[in-house]
Amino acid sequence: MPPRPRFDRRAPVRELPNINDRINYPKLRVVDADGTQLGVINREEALDVAKDRELDLVLVSEKADPPVCRIMDYGKFKFEQEKKAKEAKKKSHQTEVKEVKMRYKIDQHDYNVRIGQAVRFLKAGDKVKCTVIFRGREIQHTALAETLLRRMAKDLEEQAEIQQAPKREGRNMIMFLTPRKTPLIKTDKENQIPTRAVRTITAPPRATTAAKTQLNKDQ
C-alpha cells in the first residue's frame, strides 16, 4: 500500500471562489448581467438563469440577508480584478534611491553598464544617485568628474531629469536624477537633418545681334 501523502501545514490553502455550484445558500438576491434586479429567487432558479445566458452566478455579498449574487462572466471579472490590483500595487510603489558608482577614468564598457543600471532603476520609478569616487590625489580632478556626470545626465535625458546638479560630497562627487514625468520632446531644430547647400552658377549673358556684327567686322 503506497504511503499517504503528508499534509504540509506551511503550504497556503487556496480559497476557491464562491460561484455556481459552490454557492450553498437556498435563497439568493440576484442581479442580472445588465444590472437588472431579479429579486429574491431560489438557488436552482438562479443557476438556470446564469446557464441560459452562458454566464456564471457569482456570490458578491455573503453577509447580506439573503446573500447577493450577480450573473457575470467570471473569467473576465477575475482578469479585471487582477489588473486593478496590479495597477494599485504599481501606484503604491515606494520611491527608493538607487546608487550607481564609478571612477572618473571609467572605460566605455563599464560606462555603458552604469547607464543600463540607471535606466532600469528609472523605469522602476526610483531616483538614481550617480557617484564618482575619488582615491588619493584623484580629488584634484573634480572638473573631469563633473563632466562625466553631466555626460551621464545627457545620455539619460529621455528617462530622467536632474534633481540635484553635480556637487562635492566629501571625497566623492554626486548627482541625483529623478524619473521624467513627461516624455522628452526634442525641438524641430534638434530633429532636423542638415542639408548640403546648393551652389548656384549664373550663366553668362547671351551676345546681342549688334555685338555679333561688330565681332564679324573685327575678324
UniProtKB/Swiss-Prot annotation:
UniProt key word Cytoplasm: yes
PROSITE patterns given in the database record:
IF3
MF-aspect GO terms: ribosome binding; translation initiation factor activity
**Is Cytoplasm one of the keywords UniProt gives this record?**
yes
Which keywords are on file for this protein? Answer: Cytoplasm, Initiation factor, Protein biosynthesis
| InterPro entries in the record | T_IF-3_C_sf (IPR036788), T_IF-3_N_sf (IPR036787), Translation_initiation_fac3_CS (IPR019813), Translation_initiation_fac_3 (IPR001288), Translation_initiation_fac_3_C (IPR019815), Translation_initiation_fac_3_N (IPR019814)
What's in the GO CC field? Answer: cytosol; membrane
Coiled coil (residue ranges): none
Q: Name one GO biological process term.
A: ribosome disassembly
Task: Quote the subcellular location field of this record.
Answer: Cytoplasm
Q: What's this protein's function?
A: IF-3 binds to the 30S ribosomal subunit and shifts the equilibrium between 70S ribosomes and their 50S and 30S subunits in favor of the free subunits, thus enhancing the availability of 30S subunits on which protein synthesis initiation begins.
Subunit relationships? Monomer.
* Family the entry assigns: Belongs to the IF-3 family.
Q: Which HAMAP family match?
A: IF_3
Q: What is this protein called?
A: Translation initiation factor IF-3
